A protein has these predicted regions:
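Juxtamembrane intracellular "pre-TM" segments in multi-pass secondary transporters
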Residues: 2-7, 191-226, 250
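Residue-level signature of mid-helix packing/kink "hotspots" within the transmembrane helices
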Residues: 30, 58-66, 150-151, 267-275, ...
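Extracytoplasmic gate region of multi-pass secondary transporters
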Residues: 32-33, 220-275, 330, 334, ...
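Helix-breaking motifs and short loop linkers at transmembrane-helix boundaries and internal kinks
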Residues: 44, 76, 97-103, 131, ...
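Conserved MFS/SLC helix-loop-helix module at the cytosolic interface between two early adjacent transmembrane helices
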Residues: 63-99
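Structural signature of the two symmetry-related core transmembrane helices
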Residues: 79-93, 291-307
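Cytoplasmic helix-loop-helix junction between adjacent transmembrane helices
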Residues: 107-145
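Helix-loop-helix hairpin linking two adjacent transmembrane segments in secondary transporters
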Residues: 142, 146-189
Length: 419
């Protein structure tokens, strides 16, 4: 039976603090997408230039993710988180001072640099604090904050309509700066205890980026996880990118309603799924160290028929049922990814490993969205894209079953690699 060590003090306080941090992380990055009209009225730019603001952010954010993860493995995770939050909040505030398109573009690129450091460090810190049968649920809570922040991004457009676009950046930037000061007082790395993961992850030889990357890709388990995450990204981005279009065309919905149906039901269900999947895996992990793997595979097994229901039924209510089931169960994959990495990686390289996966997810997301558009130009039905996504999820579920707990080339016992 896996070990279930006593939680360090502040373990759930840390989760709460990182929930707020995750919310601000996504809120600050997405508010710009909700105020296009106001922004273009103030700073002249073409539609392509407006799109480039987000593309530039993603390129920098994704490209630096492995290095950002390395920083969280090499230095104090809590200090990396606090620095990241303070810097991106300062840049958010500075964005409000931009007067030209070039200044706006530079702030978005700098935002990518600073925000890249947060998620790998935050999820790794959660894993350090929650070493037993609370890790998946704690991870789910933090990712829930990310989803809430993404949903609250619409506040940017609301503020821009009623005052000025810059006021949203000023407000949320100042909130982030104040919260960074709060974290400076409250956020700490966990106390070190002999044999626990926090010690294993932070002690020993100095972590070097080249050695970390070499160690990751010399692991059969990590290569499987890497491919799995990329293939799953293809399926997820197909749904994210093209579900509104499919609902609009197939059910003859107005554009606004199609967008709401495609996002609200899935996101609400996913928020619940993060917690349900985390709680389920944690309870199961008390008797089975591979629980986080099995819960993810089961979730994918349910998500496949759910998305097939959406793309085959002629009835909108049934399609909504399929969307809810899909959102609920696909979220298991997100909440269990860090626990799975904790099963298979050298503890010194946990955040670096997540950063590498983050980079791959950004690349896959961009390529999949573009490829979907190209297939649409070739008059391929959107339902075919979803069927391909369902097939991809089947492949992912099978790949997961080949991932085995344990770290190749180390003396770390499997019993220490708890979910």
């Amino acid at each position: 039976m896996p070990d279930n060590p006593k939680l360090p003090a502040r373990a759930w306080l840390i989760v709460g603090l990182l929930w707020v941090g995750g919310c601000l992380n996504y809120l600050d990055r997405v508010i710009i997408t909700t105020m296009r009209t106001s922004l273009q009225a103030s700073i002249p730019m073409t539609e392509a230039q407006f799109g480039l603001l987000t593309t530039a952010f993603l390129l920098v954010y994704g490209g630096l993710s492995p290095f950002a993860g390395y920083l969280a493995d090499r230095f104090s995770r809590s200090r990396v988180i606090i620095t990241s939050l303070f810097v991106w909040s300062l840049i958010t505030w500075l964005t409000a001072q931009a007067k030209t398109y070039e200044q706006m573009l530079v702030t978005r690129m700098l935002m990518g640099v600073s925000e890249a450091c947060f998620i790998p460090a935050a999820l790794a810190l959660v894993a350090d604090y929650h070493r037993g049968a609370t890790r998946s649920l704690a991870t789910g809570f933090v990712l829930g904050g990310v989803m809430i922040g993404s949903a609250l991004g619409g506040l940017g457009g609301w503020i821009a309509e009623r005052s000025h676009w810059s006021h949203a950046f000023s407000l949320f930037g100042l909130i982030g700066i104040v919260f960074a000061c709060v974290l400076l007082v409250l956020l700490r790395d966990p106390p070190r205890e002999n044999g626990d993961r926090a010690t294993l992850a932070q002690a020993g030889s100095t972590v070097r980026l080249g050695e970390a990357i070499k160690s990751l890709f010399s692991s059969r388990n990590f290569i499987l996880a890497f491919i799995y995450w990329g293939v799953l990204g293809i399926a997820a981005w197909m749904v994210i990118g093209w579900m509104p279009t499919y609902l609009q065309e197939h059910f003859h919905l107005p554009q606004g309603r199609a967008g709401l149906v495609a996002t609200v039901y899935v996101n609400v269900a996913s928020l619940i799924g993060l917690l349900v999947g985390g709680l389920w895996a944690d309870r199961w992990s008390r008797t089975n160290p591979r629980a986080c793997i099995y819960v993810t595979a089961i979730g994918l097994g349910i998500a496949v028929p759910a998305i097939l229901l959406v793309c085959t039924t002629p009835l909108l209510p049934l399609a909504i049922v399929g969307l809810v089931l899909y959102g609920l169960t696909i979220a298991f994959a997100s909440t269990e990814m860090m626990p799975i990495l904790c099963l298979i990686l050298d503890p010194r390289y946990i955040a670096t490993g997540f950063g590498v996966l983050n980079l791959f997810a950004c690349l896959v997301g961009g390529a999949t969205t573009f490829a979907g558009g190209a297939l649409r130009d070739a008059h391929i039905e959107v339902s075919r894209l979803f069927q391909a996504g369902a097939a991809s999820m089947v492949v992912c579920a099978v790949m997961l079953l080949f991932i085995k707990p344990g770290v190749a080339g180390t003396s770390i016992p499997t019993g220490k690699l708890d979910c």
